[in-house]
From Swiss-Prot:
Pathway: tRNA modification; 5-methoxycarbonylmethyl-2-thiouridine-tRNA biosynthesis. Residues 320-341 are annotated as: Disordered. Residues 328-337 have a biased composition (Basic and acidic residues). GO terms for cellular component: cytoplasm. This is Cytoplasmic tRNA 2-thiolation protein 1. Keywords: Cytoplasm, RNA-binding, Transferase, tRNA processing, tRNA-binding. GO terms for biological process: protein urmylation; tRNA thio-modification; tRNA wobble uridine modification. CDD domains: CTU1-like. The lineage of its organism: Eukaryota, Viridiplantae, Streptophyta, Embryophyta, Tracheophyta. It is found in: Cytoplasm. The gene is NCS6.
Amino acid sequence: MEAKNKKAVASRLCCLCNLRRPVLKRPKTLQQICRECFYEVFEEEIHQVIVQNRLFKSGERVAIGASGGKDSTVLAYVLSELNRRHNYGLDLFLLSIDEGITGYRDDSLETVKRNEVQYGLPLKIVSYKDLYGWTMDEIVKMIGLKNNCTFCGVFRRQALDRGAALLKVEKLVTGHNADDIAETVLLNILRGDIARLSRCTSITTGEDGPIPRCKPFKYTYEKEIVMYAYFKKLDYFSTECIYSPNAYRGFAREFIKDLERIRPRAILDIIKSGEDFRIATTTKMPEQGTCERCGYISSQKWCKACVLLEGLNRGLPKMGIGRPRGVNGDHNKETKKPGSVAKSIESKQCGSLDF
């Protein structure tokens, strides 16, 4: 009887330290662990991802894409801690994009401003209005809710690069987690997008562009990020974008979550499948050049952002929606060689913000 009681007590202890009571079951390992051990394994796994993939070099300036949400807030906190603990030697900055969404982004930016003080990281905010002459509120007013995520996604990606160029950083890190990457793999399969499928699982992208982007959370589950933020009592903004409930990605997200309930490792399995995909030798990949209008990296005469802006400014918001076909149907135009893309981004003008 006594042995049975001891076994019962042991089963209620953390499976790693056998000292404290567990507070959660890890989604990808199903281990029941205590809070202290969770902090340790969570941070150590991210450190190992950084080291094994050689994401940074000592002395580099690194911008953290900060939205105020759970992912970027936890990323900023953990990267700051690891930078000090393991002496990465990085100069870290927060980079936020103001899309101009009243009642959403203005509130989340207040969270980022608090994070700036809490973590002691300099903050740079770049707005769509300054870059493109439009806010997302104005764009949605013109085009409606359909396709608004296309505009925002294109503009946001370029805005992050332009903000990073202003900060003169060598790397840009984002809080994309394992769930996000699994969703992207699934979406690219459903769309038949071979080009994007070939690179969406890469932990570092854009190495041929102005500023490489890294994803330290590539193998980190969203659930664990939420739990880490909760236990650490981190200050983050949890409201969903008011324009995104009907986004196509949302359906993929729900499907992934259903799979995870049945098989917890489904997320990592999907990422592994994406990594194992190989591009057929007959598939011709578009050659990267630079946009004639703004100098941003592009495989067409004009980059996607400039095509979308041209449509907005001409009252033709559907221009540029869908697969890239070049400007005015001229998709076979010869593109400029990349050369010094970073220099082009800083020296060309986009909207009213001069780079």
